[in-house]
Amino acid sequence: TKWKNKGHVKFNAYAGFNFDFLLTSHTLFSNLYSFPWLFSTNACQMDTLPLARNMEYYNPNILKTDINKKNHKIFKLASLCAMNGFPIKDSHTAKDDTLGLKNLTEYLKKNDSELFNKNLQFINKKDVLPYVKNLKYFYTTETFFSKTRQFACCFLTEHSFYAGYILAFDLKHDPKDIFEGKSNQELSKLLFATPVKMRTIKSNRLPLILKPEEKWVQSIQDEYSAIGKDELEKRA
């Protein structure tokens, strides 16, 4: 009742989409408690880890990061807080980690409020599908092997099993080379062979969706900028 009466509440965590929110949901469910973020009060979830990764990717000067032995940037909460001037007093304790998360989130918002708010554009997961379906093509981000990168994609379809999952075609590949004159067996083999031809957008995990003309996309020189906007539009 306390959270329900508050109305529009953002439940924030660090790596929450991969751990905290899942653990909390399972714990609440197993003990027959209600889900405070599932009430129809515009409550929602956000996660500062992917937000920090996205913001550092498009604005590399916004965060100082430590480097590990593999020469990868470290995005652990305690490390980011220490590197940027607000160290966590007692790391891995509930109170101090919460204060660290608060400080980091406020730091990101203060230093680039425009990009910060852009990352929160789809905090309501129901807004993602109609938005991407109405775009010729768009850019989204993914992080794997400790590196964040952008992908130019066009909408393909909704996932047949996982609600809220959107399948998008990666436009670094020419669809003519994949779809023309192929049997179903050949097509299936090509689509699921590496490199991956499709990207999965999870609507409930606060995806960043950018239009091709937005300044953040324009600031990145990559394989898509080499292909060029005209060719990407043809492929879409």
What are these regions (language model features)?
Residues 14, 33, 57-58, 107, ...:
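Sequence-level detector for tyrosine residue identity
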Residues 1-30, 74, 82-83, 181-236:
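Conserved non-catalytic scaffold segment of RNase H-like nuclease domains
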Residues 121-201:
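Acidic catalytic cores of enzymes that act on phosphate-bearing nucleotides/polynucleotides
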Residues 44-47, 93, 170, 174, ...:
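Poly-acidic low-complexity segments
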Residues 62-80, 139-164, 214-230:
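A broadly tuned preference for mixed-charge, low-complexity surface segments
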Residues 110-112, 121, 125, 230-236:
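Polar helix-capping/helix-linker motif
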Residues 3-114, 119-122:
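Metal-dependent phosphoesterase core characteristic of DEDDh/y 3'-5' exonuclease domains
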